[in-house]
């Protein structure tokens, strides 16, 4: 089966949703109210103008009487514009002959398709017509992902040194501003209601998790549905072939386990949208290795350079190494990219140089993993916790500094960030002999509201005494608006005496403040990690 056929199968349900929404757009309004009465509501948002402009053009809406009704209107508006943007990008790709632009458009079509799905998921979750099926915290996660997707699309052009041609295509939709308005309004409801991120039923499961999925999450032992083996002793010789079979399931609510026997698998994996509940089990991170060599200098966007790209919900990987062997001279080269909500990586090794691990979006948990890299080697805009992990800066190019994290929060209301808890930061073997000659920092602000915390972690002398770095030397970008924090760390470089003195840097002294970034609170882990068979600590 060729790549295009696989993509067509993987995206079939997404295309059906988008076509349906395109057809139904004129029917989504009801004959009540008028645009002038909405101005007061729009004035409460961060971006009143695109809000008012949208409702002037779509004047058949029902005037909201409370903020929850206004939220539904905003999400409907954002979804309408996202569908329009996806349609424009798809049409543009039909006439595009430039190889680099084709690569950027392929990413953008996928990302905007996911944005539509996240907005639709939010709408179904918060609408009174369907009955509340999610918490405000869930909605904030999905809205955060929708906004992250638009930013990832925009940045693809700069990766390949082509002019930003995607922004003009979608500019009249004002989609990013409309999603930011959704985040602000939903965020207000989240704060006002003190909505607990772990809200669920009496057994701790989120209300949107079905009974079948609850049984699935409670399974302690698993049997492989398919076996992959290089020597031909399994069902397939490649991991992607097994993933493609899983993607053809009519029902994806049951866990699909793929056992990958020891071996080096030179391939690029894609677990696409709607290919949910995949579990990859290897023979250990030293024995089951998935490796690739794509890079930005090799003609790929950062997003598409990933050796493994994970999008389907509830993905689990256990005992596997993900490598990108492009090398430090090739620039951005991702080993693992996850956009999978409620995804788990246990006892995995993620190995690369620049941009090793793209924690792109959604809620993610990494336990007892090894992560190797040089520049910005943990980056993205997920809500992610690394617990009991070992983080290993490697030897970079001459003159380069190592930066462990580059968190990508673009909106103050996004509930995203990187939390490193009870972990170890030490030099990789290739850096150790020359560790004094290379500066290493725990993070720098990729975006305006970058958020990273390091909690109860051993910090070796590999880390510079100042701890953190500006985006570039002398830059003040994000230094007042970021949130970087440390809490009860240990080790030679754990002292905060010589740390940066930015407005956005904090030394936390109260457990109550630090606990906001625990597994239980930051990613609602107590609602979906129990019963997975993966150990975790919910509090600090």
UniProtKB/Swiss-Prot annotation:
It comes from the Eukaryota. One of its GO terms (cellular component) is extracellular region. Expressed in siliques. Its EC number is 3.1.1.11. Glycans are attached at residues 34, 91, 95, 120, 161, 195. Residues 225-526 are annotated as: Pectinesterase 60. The active site is at 355 (proton donor), 376 (nucleophile). Residues 1-31 form the signal peptide. Keywords: Aspartyl esterase, Cell wall, Cell wall biogenesis/degradation, Disulfide bond, Glycoprotein, Hydrolase, Secreted, Signal. It is found in: Secreted, Cell wall. InterPro entries: Invertase/methylesterase_inhib, Pectin_lyas_fold, Pectin_lyase_fold/virulence, Pectinesterase_Asp_AS, Pectinesterase_cat, Pectinesterase_inhib_dom, Pectinesterase_Tyr_AS. It catalyses: [(1->4)-alpha-D-galacturonosyl methyl ester](n) + n H2O = [(1->4)-alpha-D-galacturonosyl](n) + n methanol + n H(+). Substrate binds at residues 302, 332, 444, 446. GO terms for molecular function: enzyme inhibitor activity; pectinesterase activity. Its main location: secreted. Disulfide bonds join 369-389. PANTHER family: PECTINESTERASE (PTHR31707). Acts in the modification of cell walls via demethylesterification of cell wall pectin. In the N-terminal section; belongs to the PMEI family. This is Probable pectinesterase/pectinesterase inhibitor 60. It comes from Arabidopsis thaliana. The lineage of its organism: Eukaryota, Viridiplantae, Streptophyta, Embryophyta, Tracheophyta. The gene is PME60.
